[in-house]
Amino acid sequence: MPAYAGFEMGPIRPPSEAQSLLLRLTRNCPWNRCSFCSVYKKHSFSLRPLADVLRDIDTIAGLVKALRGDPDATDIQLQQLSAAEEQACHAAGQWLRSGMESVFLQDGDSLVMKPEQLIEVLQHLRRCFPRIQRITSYARSATVARISQTHLQQMAAAGLNRIHIGLETASDTLLKMINKGTSKAQHIEAGLKIRRAGMELSEYVLTGIGGEEFSSEHARETAAALNQINPDFIRFRTLRILDGTELFPGSEQHRWQRPTDLVQAQEILLLIQQLEGITSRIKSDHMFNLLQEIDGTLPEDKQRLIDILQSFIDLPPQQRAWFQVGRRSGHFQRLSDLQLPGRRAEVEGICRRYGISPENVDAKLHAMIQEQMQRGMF
């Protein structure tokens, strides 16, 4: 077994875990074949040794004591940290400032760890930090489906209380074409198992994944699955991939066509219209999303969310283009910002300067986002 190399952190986390301590249990993704995801493509998967994960927890506990000035923190000299320890110190300091309420287990699917080992990690976290309110993790539906209900309930009892699952879509056609490695039925099975275990469940829906051809199927099939699962959160994510990415490697007949912002708004509208009998919180909490004001709880906010989407769809083409540019440039946050004369004038100026019109707005914005992605800004 390789020697302990120090505290580790993985590359990503959900936006909702911005204040969480990031604790790495695994490296990269055990599946790593989804056509739309490039995060781990150049890296192989590995499980970190249990002893290393427990040592990471002890390291953070010691650093927190030292940063607080606790008299029993005699074994850590903050001014003499090695380069490998600086990352842990930064993580401990940031977590301490945020209130030390939540922990996110990395990387892409921490539940592939042996249940007994994961439970030991959770118990050690609770022993070291008894005031933690939330411990969360990414998980794949295929992984959850293989875990016994008893083990899931034991994980929940040990403190794991929220799971983030990349549903992406519940269309079996699309799931096969994007090589997701799961099915609609398995998505439903996994979601229900998490709910029965008493954990919160966030399901992520990838808007635009079906292109224009499969937009309606994506919306309807995904809504049908969500209606059976009734997750605590439904979170929308706008698909962003580099040009040249083969999104449908599992199909010889179909090629993905990038949908416009209007098509994606219509897709989200259709999906929300199809949601019935559930009490999920809907969130659009990512910088890529055009309409971040899509935020509400079902069923009471359903009509308000529908009205927001319909308002964007019904805008005259020129105003719709202004809003698209205003959102991507940071001038607008909400549809109502179109009514602010100063901000709107600035956006109109941007459109004139760069020759942006209703006919080319999606292409122009796509080119801008592609440049930013290639520069590593996202």
Residue ranges of predicted features:
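Auxiliary Fe-S-binding modules of radical SAM enzymes
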Residues: 1-17, 227, 233-235, 241-378
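Canonical Radical SAM [4Fe-4S] cluster-binding loop centered on the CxxxCxxC motif
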Residues: 12-76
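Hydrophobic faces of well-ordered beta-strands that scaffold small-molecule active sites
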Residues: 21-23, 101-105, 135-137, 163-165, ...
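Conserved, mostly hydrophobic/aromatic
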Residues: 29, 37, 53, 105, ...
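Aromatic/hydrophobic pocket-lining residues that form the small-molecule binding cavity
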Residues: 53, 118, 148, 187, ...
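Conserved SAM/AdoMet-binding glycine-rich loop
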Residues: 62-196
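Conserved strand-turn element in the central/C-terminal portion of the radical SAM core barrel
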Residues: 142, 166-176, 193-218, 237-243, ...
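Catalytic cores of alpha/beta
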Residues: 147-153, 211-228
